[in-house]
C-alpha cells in the first residue's frame, strides 16, 4: 500500500479522531424559568458585584498560552530542576538513555560476551 492510499473498506484511517459516520449530537435548549403571575411581592435583593469578581470568575488561562511559555524539548515544567551533575545529563532533554562513555578505550565493555565468546 502506498502513501496516501485508502486502508480499505472505504473508510478513513483517521475515523478514530473525527468520529467516523456518527451523527453530531443535537444541542439541547436551555430551560426557561416559569413567568411569575404577580409583581406585588418584595423585590429580590440586588447583589453588588465588583469588576474584579467578574474578571477573576471569567478569566482563564488558555492551554496554548501555557505551552508557549515552556521551552522546546521540555515536556513539563516539573522536570526543570537543578541537578548535581549538570543540566545536560541523563534524559533531561530527549528522554533517551545516556550516551556517556563508562569504560576507557580498549578497556572493559558490556559487549565483551559477544566478541570474546564468554571467556
UniProtKB/Swiss-Prot annotation:
Superkingdom: Eukaryota
Q: Where is the composition biased (Gly residues)?
A: 1-11
Q: Where does the record place it?
A: Cytoplasm, Cytoskeleton, Phragmoplast; Cytoplasm, Cytoskeleton, Spindle
Knockout consequences: Isotropic expansion of endodermal and cortical cells in root, etiolated hypocotyl, and dark-grown influorescent stem, and induce right-handed spiral in epidermal cell files of these organs.
**Post-translation changes:** Ubiquitinated. Upon salt-stress induction, it is subject to proteasome-dependent degradation.
The UniProt entry's GO biological process terms, in alphabetical order, are:
anisotropic cell growth; cellular response to salt stress; cortical microtubule organization; unidimensional cell growth
Kindly state the tissue distribution recorded for this protein.
Answer: Ubiquitous. High expression was associated with tissues undergoing rapid cell expansion, including the root elongation zone, hypocotyls of dark grown-seedlings, and cotyledons of light-grown seedlings.
Region annotation (Disordered) maps to: 1-47, 85-105
InterPro entries, per database record = SPR1/2/3/4/5
Biased-composition ranges for Pro residues? Answer: 24-34
Q: What are the alphabetically sorted keywords of the record? A: Cytoplasm, Cytoskeleton, Microtubule, Ubl conjugation
Entry's family note? Belongs to the SPIRAL1 family.
Could you tell me what this protein does? Answer: Required for directional control of cell elongation. Stabilizes growing ends of cortical microtubules and influences their dynamic properties. Acts redundantly with SP1Ls in maintaining the cortical microtubules organization essential for anisotropic cell growth. Plays a key role in salt stress-induced microtubules disassembly.
Recorded protein name is Protein SPIRAL1
List the lineage, top down.
Eukaryota, Viridiplantae, Streptophyta, Embryophyta, Tracheophyta
